[in-house]
Regions:
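Conserved, mostly hydrophobic/aromatic
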Residues: 80
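Short, well-ordered beta-to-alpha junction loops that form the rim of enzyme active sites
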Residues: 83
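Conserved beta-strand-loop surface patch within small alpha/beta domains used
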Residues: 1-77, 86-151
């Protein structure tokens, strides 16, 4: 599988990861319905109740609201992104156990406050393994209606 992201969307995700450092950030990947073409991202609050340097949690009510917002624009949630402060962009055992198999999971490694390696993962139905997903970066510009056009 391939997930496609606009360059600006990836830059927004990296900026979010850097601003949250040394804690993990989290957010949603928004795409056209039934598509892996990510046209936007939505920052989410890290609602994890413990130390946030190696964990994140998205509040289910906030996820529901974001899903409704995306649907009102004819879009859908294609996945989740989060950062790994001072740790590789791998998908941890905790990440696997708490993932939703239909989503792509973009992980950004942030080293000393600077976003770097970014990888995408697809968990399997049994929550015991993941496959790496290819990331294709598109040079696109966003439109106000949520549709992206290639530059």
């Amino acid at each position: 599988m391939v997930i496609r992201l606009g360059r600006r969307t990836l830059e927004d995700i990296h900026a979010h990861a850097e601003s949250a450092y040394p804690e993990e950030c989290c957010g949603l990947l928004i795409a056209g319905s039934g598509s892996k073409d990510v046209v936007d991202s939505i920052k989410m609050r890290n609602a994890f109740s413990g130390p946030r340097h190696d964990r994140y949690h998205i509040d289910p009510l906030e996820l529901f609201r974001a899903d409704r917002e995306a649907a009102s624009r004819g879009l859908t949630i294609a996945g989740v992104y989060h950062s790994h402060p001072d740790y590789p962009a791998t998908f941890s055992k905790f990440d696997i156990e708490h993932s939703f198999p239909l989503y792509s999971y973009l992980v950004v490694s942030v080293s000393k406050g600077e976003a770097g390696d970014t990888r995408s993962w697809l968990p399997n139905q049994d929550h015991n393994s993941v496959a790496e997903e290819e990331i294709e970066i598109l040079d696109v510009r966003r439109e106000e209606d949520g549709v992206t056009k290639r530059a």
